[in-house]
Amino acid sequence: MEPYKIILVDDHSLFRNGLRGLLERCAACRVVGEAASGEEFLAMLGGVDADVVFMDFAMPGLDGAQTTERALAQRPDLKIITLSMFGEESYYSRMVEAGARGFLLKDSDIGDVIEAVETVAAGGSYFSPQLLSSLTGRMRTREDAADE
């Protein structure tokens, strides 16, 4: 099997370098491009083939949602996974509405990252376990409040 081709889009070079290092340890993954901004990613989009894009949410200039919308308008086949420090509902809702197929918190372990790549590359969706746990907890709280 060919390795998954991955692009990293994040304005923090230290984070990109660390994630690239972790992904390169995985025989099933190959980083084929990096961008420090949404604008840089959109400029490179036509010249790089990728299976999965890891997209930061909070970047200067175009944020992750704006970049995702524009990228998918050019390449509807792209599979984008959001990487963010922010797990609030407004962030992942915005990214899902923009067309992202997954959402990982930046404190996820490498096993979750690899599982997200495999799941999203195969056409599925992936949301970090911490995020799903938080979401279901909030939903239960709302249901309990509505029952009172």
Where are these regions (language model features)?
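Short amphipathic alpha-helix used as the core "switch/output" element in two-component signaling
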Residues: 65-77
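Active-site beta3 strand of CheY-like receiver
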Residues: 48-54
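Receiver (REC) domain active-site loop signature in two-component systems and cognate sites
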Residues: 59
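Short, flexible helix-to-coil linker/hinge segments that flank and couple to helix-turn-helix
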Residues: 90-97, 101-148
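Short hydrophobic/Thr-rich beta-strand motif most characteristic of the beta2 strand and flanking loop
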Residues: 28-36, 44
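A short, hydrophobic beta-strand element within the central beta-sheet of small alpha/beta folds
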Residues: 77-87
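Acidic catalytic/metal-coordinating carboxylates
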Residues: 37-40, 62-66
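Active-site residues of response regulator receiver
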Residues: 10, 56, 84
